Amino acid sequence: MKYDEFYKLCEKVYEPITNFEKSCLPLCAAENEQSEFTKIPLKSFIQDKYIMGGIEEYQEHNNFIGSNNLFELYNLLNRLSSELFKSMYADGRTLTGVNTISLLLMSLFKNNDKILISDEECGGHSSMPKLCKRLGIKTCSMPYDYNNYDFDYEKLNTLLLDDSIKGILICQSDMIFQPKLEKIKMDKNKILIYD
């Protein structure tokens, strides 16, 4: 395929995305409308846009609004990479958010490892238990003190004495206060991921 054809296809795919951008303000669930982070999508065209599933076949069910436009762009990138580099697969998604956590979990833990996570009931990101399950990582909820809107560090530190616990994933989506990481006591063989 000639590269000017790719350029025309890119323009065709790009137009619905920019139209979508003009009519929507995509907010991250963990941010309020005044934060600088939520203004990034207004300044950039593709940064921090999400699409669930792979990029070879679009999964419409429960996917993000506007992700069908993004899928077309990733599909075009995949085709161009195949043409230029003879690659079988190219993933142009940015290494941010859930993509980063996925990579960290796959790199730092093994199948059947057990970790503590901040679950949905205490403001944790709702996709983390599902992601861990898909990667074969067992999860337990971090103890939470609902009266103080914070983790129960005494109970947490007791749990961390268990050698079968390989680490902690604190991935908050909705939170009132920053967790006090300095109160977590863990040995050097355990891993803490904080997003």
Question: Language model features by range: what are they?
Answer:
Residues I46, Y50-T100, S107:
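Conserved N-terminal alpha-helix of the aminotransferase class I/II PLP-enzyme fold
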Residues V98-L103, G123-M128, I176-K180:
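Short glycine/serine/threonine-rich phosphate/pyrophosphate-binding segments
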Residues F177-D195:
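Catalytic PLP-binding core of fold-type I/II PLP enzymes
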Residues F109-G124:
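Conserved PLP-anchoring active-site segment centered on the Schiff-base-forming lysine
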Residues L131-Q178:
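PLP-dependent aminotransferase-class I/II
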Residues M1-H61:
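N-terminal "arm"/small-domain region of PLP-dependent enzymes with the aminotransferase-like
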Residues T38-P41, T100-L108:
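Buried hydrophobic packing segments
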Residues Y89-T94, I117-S118, L169-I170, L192-D195:
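General beta-strand structural signal in soluble alpha/beta enzymes
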